[in-house]
Every structure is written in structure tokens, then in C-alpha cells.
Amino acid sequence: LKPIYFREPSVNIGVGDNPGKVPHITGEDFRIRYGIGGGTPLDYALTYDDFVAHAQAYGKVGGLDRVATVLNAIRADRPDALLLDGGDTWHGSMTCLKTQGQDMVNVMNALKPDAMTFHWEFTLGSERVQEIVEGLPFAALGQNIFDREWDEPAELFKPYEFFERGGVKIAVIGQAFPYMPIANPGWMFPEYSFGIRDEHMQEMVDEV
């Protein structure tokens, strides 16, 4: 919610043939790959290089009030734009932990995204996720969120949502993080299974 001092990691290990390849590069290698000058705001925001000096020079980063300012500017310039929340939103701070995600839910509702999908949200537990989703004023999408017992799409999460912008009809298909029970405690959401489900995704593409 509030601006913080955030240091990017100094290590990102890729397995197999991936070490040293995007996205498994950090620091100077990252700057060189993307042509970012040393000591610049982007250097501070996207690498760990000389973090203390950069933090002293540039201050804290983030804060949803600043995100709102950017969103308002984009919407004023491009009113037909969609705002999509890719997940990892209802977690990560003490206030989020204490409120069971409600602080972030309130703020995201105020930002008025058009749709969202999921990742760490499920660490709140399936009952809390269901409670929040049932009250959302926007679409909660996940074509790959299935009922574990019946191996069928979970009714709570729509696979897709239609929008019309500038006379163009748009279908947004939700894809939650596929390895949820590996990256997060599976006992917190035993009712659900995930996975890539590429065949079901193709069915949804064909359907829309």
C-alpha cells in the first residue's frame, strides 16, 4: 500500500540450459541486456547495484497512491484501456496478513480493474478467497482452476469475460498460476487443482 525501500535480488538461478538467459539475469548483466544506464532511476528500480546509494538518492518506490496517479493518467489518455490484475495482490504485508487481504481488496476495488486472476491469493485459504471473490465488483477469472474431486472447472471462477472497447469485442481468458500447490501450501486450498491445462485453454479460445 505504501512506498517502501525495495532491493531487487542479486541472484536468479535458471535450471538446465537457462542460467544467464532472460529472465535469469540480474544486476549489471540485466542493465547491459536492456541498455539501462548505471545510476539511473531504472537502475535503482530494476537492479540491486549500489542499492544503498541509490536508495538515498531516489527514496522509496511503489505505493498504490502512485499507481492510482499513473492509472488515472492512462485512463484519461486512453479511456478504452483495460486494467487487468495478474494476481499476487492480496498478500505480502503485515496489514494484509492482519486483515486477511481486506486492505488490498478495498484498494483494488477503488482502482476498478476490469478482471483479475490468481496466485498467492490462495494462501489466504479457499474459504477466504471464496468470500472475497463473491463480493468482487469485477470478474475473477481462472480457466485452469478446477474442482479437485470432480476434475471440472470450479464454478466460482469464470474462465473468461467479454469486454467491448472502441467497437471491438475483447475476450480476456484467465490463467491462474499453474503450480499453485507446489509454490504455496496446498493444504490451504484442498478443494482446487490447477495446472497449465493447455487443452482446456484451447477449448476456451475456440469457444470465445
Annotate each predicted stretch with a short phrase.
Residues 1-208:
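Acidic, metal/ion-coordinating pockets
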